[in-house]
Amino acid sequence: DAPKIPPAMVSEAAFAKRRDTSVEDTMLTALSQFVVKRGDLKTVIAGYPWFLDWGRDTLIALRGLVVGNFRPEAEAIILQFASYADRGTIPNMIFGGNADNRDTSDAQLWLFTACSDLCRAEGGFSFLEQQVRNGKTLLESLISLAEGLIAGTPNGIAVDPESMLVFSPSH
């Protein structure tokens, strides 16, 4: 037997309340529900309850956070993932404190895109001077990521210096 839906949830009054909410407000409310704390910063959960914070998914979602005016949250998420930058990689997934899964060929590129979107929205580049937990500025972390991608990462991801195409072995 399917669970019974309480009558109060399907009453005319319940629907009227939802009908008066714009689609934009509904989407912004839904967007905010995926942003969660991770330590002293923030992240995006890819999907409850099965998925945690996946680098690529999170960084793609940042475009919506920036456009939706969730800039402090977007900044905290960027700093979170940039703090894990290492030899051209960022985590594909963070599981608790474990960020060893780095088999993502384009999450780093989405991090660059998120930084660009945020700087454009803020009208300047001062955000790039913020300190990341790894002791570098965000700009230094981005430069390190780019250099690591061009040199080739420990898991075989590399950018061709002539075409700038990303190569990734199957993971």
Predicted regions and their residues:
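Acidic, mature catalytic/reactive cores of soluble proteins
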Residues: 1-171
